[in-house]
Structures are given as C-alpha cells and as structure tokens.
Amino acid sequence: MFKYSDNIALEGKLSDNQNNNLTSLNFFSKSNINAFKKLFINKGIEFDNVSTKKKKEEDKNIPSINFVITNLINILNKKDTMLKETMLNHIAKKNYKCRNIQRKNKDKNFKLKKYIKLDIETKNETKKNQKYKKFIVHPIFKKSIEIKNQSNEFKQINIFHNFNDKFFFRKDRYSNIKSNKSIFSDNKILRCFRNFRKNTPDLFFLKNINKISNVTTYETNTFKDNNNKKHLKCVNSSLELLNSKKNDKWKQVINHQILLSISNKENKAEISFTPEYLGSIHIKIKMRNDQATLNFISNHDEVKVFLKNCIPFLKNSLMKNGIQLEKINIYNSSFSKNHISQKNKRIVKNYFFHGNEFKKTFNFQENYMKLIQYKSIDMYI
C-alpha cells in the first residue's frame, strides 16, 4: 500500500515539473516569434523600397521598349508586304508565261490547220485542173465550144430582140412594130399547139383564152436600133487628105481607136473624117484569147489602099500591147450587108420550120377558120 502511495506522489511531482517546463517553452516560443516579426517587418520595408526603385526604373524603360517594339513590328510588316509583292509578281509572271505558251501552241495548231487546208485545196485544184485538161482534149468538149460560139453569134444578131409580151393583144401593137426597123420584112408566125395524144385539132388557147402564154409570136429583126448605142467618133480637122506626110497620123488615130474600143470591151468603132467624100471607116473587132480579128468597112477605094498599107504598123503596135492579129478583112458596105443577110437566112432555117413541114404538121387555114367561129376573141393575127 505504502509503495503505491509513494509512486503516486512521485508521479504527481513529475507532472508538476512537466507543466512548468511547458510554460517555459511557451514563453520562449512567443519571444522568438516576436523577434522574427521584427526582422520580417524590417526586411519587408527594405523589399518595398527596392521594389519601388525597380518600378521607377521600369517605368522609365517602358517608352523606349515600346518604341523599339513598334519599330520592329513596322520592319516585320514591311518585310511581309515585300514578300507578298514578290510572290504576287512571281505568280503573275508564271501565269503570263503559261498564257504565252498556250497562245503559241494555239498559233502553231492554227498554222498547222491552215497549212493542211492549203495543201488540201492545192491538191483539189490540181486534180480539177487535170480533169479539166483531160476534158478539154476530149472532142465532145470542142464541139460544145463551137456550138456556144455559134449561139453567141446568133445572140449578136438579135432576131428575137424586138419580141415582147406587151405587143400581144394590144391596139398599139402595130405602131410599135413599125418603129422597129428591120432588113427583112416583118414576118410573123403563129404557132398553134395541138393535142398530139388524141390527134385532134383542138387548140389550147381556145379553151383558156385568158392564158396568153400558150400563143407565141416571133418577129424577125436582125439588128438592134443603132441609135441607142454610143459609137466612138474621132473627128480630126487636120486629117484632110491621104498625103504621104499625114499617113503616120492616120495610122496612130486608127490604132488609138482600136485600143480604146478593146479596153472598153466594145465590138464596134467608127472613125469619121472632115472631108465628106472620104466617108467613114467602120471597124468590127473580135477578141479570143488575146487574138484579134479586124473587119474594116469603107466605100472609098483610096481608104482601102491605105488600110492595106496600115497592116504591118497595126501588127507591131498591137504586139507591144500584148495582142496578136489573126486576120484583117476590108469590105464594102454592100458586101457586109449581103454577108449578114446570108447569115440571117441560115440561122432562120435552123431555128424555124420549113414551109413544107409546117404545112404537113399544122394546117394553119383550118385552125384559122375555127378561130373565127368563136366570138370571144377580138383580135386575130
């Protein structure tokens, strides 16, 4: 029992000692904390002073830094713009080069196409020329050319020139026919059409009186009215007589007149002189492939002799102008009229029916009597 009580007392003392120690420790820690606070406060004041100085220095350096930064930004922007411009120029040059290349290629293709077309056209022309040459050599073509020339001569004579539909079934027809002078008598032919299938004498124009196209009339007049044409005249008062001195002037005048009519594409020319007894010279020209044939017509014998002497001069002068003389014919006016009348008779025989054949095929009197029976027709030919 006593032992336990002793231990408790000891423990109580020990506990009291411990409490004293704790109080001492608490006091020591508080003192230390206060000391530390003082130190920290002093250091904080120093730090604040240092920070304020640094802030002032930094505030001074801020505008210089901003200036530097703005300059750097401007420099960078300029470099960017320069780079962009160079890039754009480079791209534009590339595009321009590409376009030029494309154009050149197109031009080359176009030139090739043109060259090919020209080759094809030249080949076709050569083929056509070869065929045409072969065709020219053929005798049928030669005959066709002869027929064309004959038809052109026939057109120059103009047998059907005075024919017009206006003259048919008109009261003033006869007055118009009288004004058109002709070498032949005005022979009018009525051509009546039959129904050859039925072999009946019924006339087409009896059934349809209003249709004038079923009846055709032809008037044979050999020449056009020469008053309408403009004949070239050269009057020279100096050329009075056929003297030897004035022969050169005569020759030059005739040569000039022939060349002038050829250049104007006229087939006729006329030269009249001041002395009336010499008369005038009528010239007819025919041109074929730069080859000329001249027909002189005059009634005076001295003029004919002079024209015969002019032949070598005319040949030389026309050769200088690129024209060759095939023939030169000298006629009287009476011979030319007879020659023309013979030609006209031949052409009329070729283009109209003969008298016997006309009587066999068409009984004109019978048809005429049948026309009289119909009272609807007012005029008869």
Swiss-Prot record:
Name of this protein: Flagellar hook-length control protein
InterPro entries recorded: Flag_hook_Flik, Flagellar_hook_control-like_C, FliK, FliK-like_C_sf
A Pfam family per the record: Flg_hook
GO cellular component: bacterial-type flagellum hook
Described function: Controls the length of the flagellar hook.
Family designation: Belongs to the FliK family.
Gene: fliK
Organism, scientific name: Buchnera aphidicola subsp. Schizaphis graminum (strain Sg)
Entry text on domains: Two-domain protein with the central portion of the sequence acting as a hinge or connector between the two.
Tagged with keyword tRNA-binding: no
Keyword check for Cell cycle: no
Single GO BP term: bacterial-type flagellum assembly
UniProt keyword list: Bacterial flagellum biogenesis
